[in-house]
Amino acid sequence: ERTLIPAIIPPGTAHPNGVFCVGGADNRILTACAGFASSLLLDFSARAAPKSGIYQAVFDRLPAPCQRHPLLPALLLRTLRLNCLTDAYADLWAECFDPSFTSDSWTIPDRATTPLGDVGPTWTSQTPLRRAVDRRQALVEIDALVALMLGITADQLCTVYRTQFAVLYGYDHDQYFYDAHGRLVPNQVLKVRRKKGEAITEAERTATTYRYDLPFHTYDRELDMHIAYVEFERRLETRGTDS
């Protein structure tokens, strides 16, 4: 599904040699690079040449974000809300917090369950995105942001997704179903739903301690990336007009 799988690790943690890590003095740059690395375009760049692992030589040739780009705060907010899952990231959140975060919003407002800009300078348990549909939307918008920042068109981005990420494309259309509350529906529930359709019972829609409420949806990643790209392009043009 993916080759380049980034994560921001907090201070005091360790990892085996199979994981390559980078660091630096400026955590805003580190966070921006993590956001870039989570995009489909950088994953495509990383897998372009045969390799047994992802080490410095691979990472060094990947494109990096411009630290003066007007869309950088949007990239930082989505990356931070995806990665800052516990209070171990509280210092990172405080250091990277930008007042513009509070005026940011999703490109598809009625899709996510959590307002994007509903954050403050201090990390709380409400800071990270935890619901599956919210995390998916943040990744889709990061894909659009990175493409726009690199001068890649929305059509080119969608072509990369459709032709180079066949497994993800298949999951998006056949496996990744979200319930009415934005939770990812587990396979054991989907198997029954495929047989019985909307006639699936409440007991059959219950797994572990969760009841997954109908209707179940898949989402069109290509359409969502197009919408996000056009909206970020509009915001960028508006910012240029206002400045």
Q: PLM features: residue spans?
A:
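S-adenosyl-L-methionine
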Residues: 1-243
